[in-house]
Each structure stands twice: as structure tokens, then as C-alpha cells.
Amino acid sequence: MDVNPTLLFLKVPAQNAISTTFPYTGDPPYSHGTGTGYTMDTVNRTHQYSEKGKWTTNTEIGAPQLNPIDGPLPEDNEPSGYAQTDCVLEAMAFLEESHPGIFENSCLETMEVVQQTRVDKLTQGRQTYDWTLNRNQPAATALANTIEVFRSNDLTSNESGRLMDFLKDVMESMNKEEMEITTHFQRKRRVRDNMTKKMVTQRTIGKKKQRLNRKSYLIRALTLNTMTKDAERGKLKRRAIATPGMQIRGFVYFVETLARRICEKLEQSGLPVGGNEKKAKLANVVRKMMTNSQDTELSFTITGDNTKWNENQNPRMFLAMITYITRNQPEWFRNVLSIAPIMFSNKMARLGKGYMFESKSMKLRTQIPAGMLASIDLKYFNDSTKKKIEKIRPLLVDGTASLSPGMMMGMFNMLSTVLGVSILNLGQRKYTKTTYWWDGLQSSDDFALIVNAPNHEGIQAGVDRFYRTCKLVGINMSKKKSYINRTGTFEFTSFFYRYGFVANFSMELPSFGVSGINESADMSIGVTVIKNNMINNDLGPATAQMALQLFIKDYRYTYRCHRGDTQIQTRRSFELKKLWEQTRSKTGLLVSDGGPNLYNIRNLHIPEVCLKWELMDEDYKGRLCNPLNPFVSHKEIESVNSAVVMPAHGPAKSMEYDAVATTHSWIPKRNRSILNTSQRGILEDEQMYQKCCNLFEKFFPSSSYRRPVGISSMVEAMVSRARIDARIDFESGRIKKEEFAEIMKICSTIEELRRQK
């Protein structure tokens, strides 16, 4: 049956229909090939926005650098990065005047964090540029490699486990004449296969030592690796994002901690809160402006968009802000916080993999690595690429591009929010000293501006003044993309406000459905998503019930577990029918074993195993949840697991769901093809860390949330813990004398082995 889509909107208020215009159903677009072109675009654009600045050369690495700070006063309409230091400092001073003690208190809180943070803070996060291997790695591996190299180069402060001490090593490493690193390499050789008698290529992985001189090391320490941002909806062109190495990460973390503490105290900041808390915060600002615009005043709201926020921000500006914010603090603290912006002023952008060339006639493919772009003949490239390469060539040093201005995506979200809020703060009547005044909301590069004035001319004047003030600190409000409306209707960070926030349900659409982790987790996540949307996103009972039925259907198709009495034939139906026939209480079978669905919108919070426990046959229970069943015991499940769900907007969210360990909570094995590549050595390292950590957490169950602090090694700690536990168990009669003696013997053997080593 064809449905005329306009019929769907006959009785729907306009604000509820807005979400249907979002590009959120279906798969998001992914990028293919290399990000080299996008990265060159970013570098070239950033320099273009600051082109009237001063050129200097970094004496350490010989990189040309462009400094637009205090450059010519910005022009109308053209985005530019010419922030004026005195204006930024003045905005900071007024922010402090309106919020007495805000900087002082935030500094004290941050100082406490700085002294307590452990190095393992840096293991959080996904892909990280690993400077030792010159490519991306999981954060934990990159950190481990860095520490390993530091220790082999006599940098040992990090052994205390404090992040602060690791950063001391980073500082010292930059003064060393050379650093010795271990790199992985591949040897290929042709050998004859004994079985098939064919020639095959055999790969062996080797590790070799390599020395980096000071210049090469500094370049790597200051490098941001670039990739293409994936899964961005509603855009035609892809764009590049950056991932910094371990030397920069720690310093950035402390700066962002300080900025986060400041943002928490600012009512106009949309960070670091999220969800319903954020909505409440925003609603307060709107309420304040609407209440104050008495009958005599007009109130308008701009749904704002800034042009190229990151590319016009400048690390030198952030340095000025930090210098001001920490001005009465101890010297060591000021130094630690100023290093991140200084490193960013000297950053280098790695251009990615390079370009792929294909010759259709000769059926040849070859890759031109990014390092060769400086010297290769440009006749092979098309015009647009030629222009890009010509522009970027003067900036290249050893195949990386010097990128002093600009910030790259997502590095200082909190600190740039503080800058944005400081301009919103200047809209108070006492500062504008005229009939118009403004307030608003800022969340990284997204803003909403509310202007009140007695008449339209006043509103226009207020907007103009805001626009110009922003220009002075390197913020470029886009006149083309921002729009103004009577206060009461606007959009901010994909929240639609219409006399209150309307649920933008389409944003959640991608997270409905079967996640593909395993049967147990998928069932749990599926119902939790529906439950959460009933709580947070106006998902009504009837729609929720329908969503649930669709989910169960989807789930049954995904895992081929249709009800035991169905006529549908699948690979599993034969086994499931057999199970169905020999089960007395058929209601007790899990959906994934061909049982009926017992979920409705009232019991979504109960894990399926618990929901059906009383209804299960004894022998079914015994197979399903028996820890001695090899299909159960393989996986230890915390009582709460967390899954990654993909909302349509923003980063993947971690969502908690209840988990019960059954035969259905299997873990898929890792793809074997990785085992034959150069990643293999890294994989083995990773597994070793994983095993050590798992073992450690067996001895210290609380270690998953509170890291032990102290100087003894992990092994010493585990041995002493084992002895204590064994004695307690022996004295309380939980273990026999022989077992106790055996444990003690093992402990002594381990200590003996350590001494010999």
C-alpha cells in the first residue's frame, strides 16, 4: 500500500515534525582511501584565515610558523584568526568580575586533581598517535610503548605512577640529544610450501633499535596524526580530525580539567553536562531572558553557527588565557598548564598515508607516501591537488606539515567554551551601558544568543556589537548560517527549543535495533534503549510497544531464533524445534532459544533470564546458567555491563545494561588475518597487558575503580595479597592445610624467580 507522506502530518504540530527532516535513518557515510587531501585542506585553510600574520621559524626543528595574534583588525564577513590579546584578557577580567573567585577556586580544585592523577588516566581514549611506531594505536598500547622507550632512555620519574611525574619525563625527553626507540618491521621472503609445493610469501616480524636525533624526536612529539572523520551525516564533503601523541595528551588533560571546573560554574556553558541536566540549564537562561523582557522589551534569539571555529582559534590565545587565569598560582602549576598551548603553537600535522595512483592501461597501482609530496613532480596530479601541494610545500619538514595557527578538532573544547562564554558575559546591561543587552548559551563551537531591546533597531545594534566583539577574539559568527527568531524557538546542540525542549526522537533512531554483540547483550541493550527513550525522549506507550515488537522480530531474524512452533525454516530451526518439543514449560525458553517474548513496556528493566527464571525447566536452567557449563564459564560478566550505542549525533555513547552470564553471552573470536601482519607483535603486547591487568584485578577486586597507590611492583603486591588471603582462608577452615602449604610454596618460588631475574 502506498502512503502519501503528507497525510502523516495532518494532525502533528510543526515542532514535532521537525525531527523527520533529519538525515538520521539508514547508514551514515564512511570515508574510503586516505585522508591526506582533507588534511592538506585543513592546513591550507587555517593558514589562509591567518595569512596577514607574521612569519617566523621555529629554531629547534626549522618549521615555518605563522602568527596572526594582534594582527590587522578583522574585516567584516571574512572569517579570520586575528585575535587581539588585550581584548581576550579584558573579556577574562570581566568574566572574573561577574563571577568572583571563579578562577581562583577552579585552580585550587585542579591543583588537587593534578597531584592525584595516575598515568593510567591516559589509557582512556581510542586511537592515539604512537610516536614510537609512527602510526595509530589503542591508547593503552601507545602509552605502554612510550613509557617503555622512556625507561630504556633513563627517564624513570614515571615509575611513581603519577601523571605529573610522567610529564616530567616528557619535558626531559625534549632536552635529550637523542632517543633510542624500538620499531617493528616486516621481512618478506619467498618459500616453498611443503604441502602444496607452491611458492608462498612468508612474513616475519622483527623488532629493531633506531636512534632519533633531537630534531626528529621533537617533530614526533609535536605531531598530530590525522584521519578522516567517519559517519558524519548531512555533509557532502568529509573532513580531517587529529589525534595527538602521548607527549601532548597529559598536558591537554590538565588544561581541560581546569577549563571544565570553570565551565561547571558558568550558567551559560553547555559543557560538561549533558542530557536532561543540560536541558534544564539551558531552559533557565531562556526563562531569565523571557521574564526580564517585560511588556516594553522585544526578545530575539539567534540560532548561531560559527565559521570554522577550530581553524580560527589560536593556541597563543589560549596561552594568554591560562596565564591570566592562573596569575596568582604557584610557579610549577602555571608552567604545567602553559605547556599544552605552547606545544600546540609548534604542532606538526602528519599528512596521513599519501595518495594512491592507478594506471588503467598498465593495471598498476602505486602509493605515493605523504613524505614524498615535497619532492615529487607535480605533473602526475590533477589541478586541485596540484594547488594543494604547491601551497603546503613551504610548510613541510620531513614529510609533516607545520601548523602553528588553528586548533584541530576537539582538543580544547572546554577552554574554547570559556572564551565563548566570556563574550556572552559582556552582554549584561552594566557592560553594554545602553538599552540592549544579551545572554546566551555556548557549547564548544555551538551557540545560541538571546538579545533583548526596546525595539528592532536595538536588537540589530545588539547583534552587531556581539558580532564585532566576537571578531576581536577570533570567533567568526556566520551571518549566512545563523538565523534569528522571536525568543521561544531556537536550536542549540541539536536540542530544539519551542517554549520548552521538544524531544528530537529521530536522533535516537540509529540506536534502535540489534547491536550484534551477542544474543544475551543484544536482548538487554535493545530493551534498555526502548526504556531509556520512554524516560528521556517522549517515546509514548503505544509507540514503545510497537518498537518492542519490531525489535523482537528483528532479533529473531538476526539470530535465526524464531519460535519453536513456527513454520519458518532457518539453519537453526531444526535444533530449536527439538528443544521446543522436549521442553515442558515452553514459556521459560529464552527468545534466543526459540521461546516466546514476555517483555512488555512494564517490565523492560528486568533481564530476560530473571523474567523467565521461575518458568524454566530445571534441566534447562542447569544448562543455561551453570558455571561449570563450558559455554557459560568462559566469560565473567560484571552485574552491569556497558555497551556502546551510536546515537545519530555526537560521539558514541556508553550505555549501561544489566547482564546475566548464560550460554548466550559468548565473545566472538578475533579475526585471524591480523595474526599474519606486522600488527602481530603489538597484539601480543596488548594481550600480555590485558592478562596482567585481569590477574591483578583478581587479587585486588577493587582495583577496577581505585588504582592501588604505592611503590611495590604488581607482582610483589599480588604475592603479599595471596599470602594474606591464604592465611585467612586457612584459619577460617575454608582451605585445607595441604592447599595452604602449596600456595605458600608457589609464592616463594615466584619471589625466587624475581630475585634471579
From Swiss-Prot:
Maturation and modification: Phosphorylated by host PRKCA.
Catalysis performed (reactions): RNA(n) + a ribonucleoside 5'-triphosphate = RNA(n+1) + diphosphate
The protein's Enzyme Commission number: 2.7.7.48
InterPro entries in the cross-refs: RNA-dir_pol_NSvirus, RNA_pol_PB1_influenza
Region (Promoter-binding site): 249-256
Subcellular localization, as worded in the UniProt entry: Host nucleus; Host cytoplasm
Gene Ontology MF, one: RNA-directed RNA polymerase activity
Keywords associated with the record: Eukaryotic host gene expression shutoff by virus, Eukaryotic host transcription shutoff by virus, Host cytoplasm, Host gene expression shutoff by virus, Host nucleus, Host-virus interaction, Inhibition of host RNA polymerase II by virus, Nucleotide-binding, Nucleotidyltransferase, Phosphoprotein, RNA-directed RNA polymerase, Transferase, Viral RNA replication, Viral transcription
GO BP term (any one): viral transcription
Pfam families linked: Flu_PB1
Function: RNA-dependent RNA polymerase which is responsible for replication and transcription of virus RNA segments. The transcription of viral mRNAs occurs by a unique mechanism called cap-snatching. 5' methylated caps of cellular mRNAs are cleaved after 10-13 nucleotides by PA. In turn, these short capped RNAs are used as primers by PB1 for transcription of viral mRNAs. During virus replication, PB1 initiates RNA synthesis and copy vRNA into complementary RNA (cRNA) which in turn serves as a template for the production of more vRNAs.
Family statement drawn from the similarity comment of this UniProt entry: Belongs to the influenza viruses polymerase PB1 family.
Name of the protein in question: RNA-directed RNA polymerase catalytic subunit
Species assigned in the record: Influenza A virus (strain A/Equine/Tennessee/5/1986 H3N8)
Gene: PB1
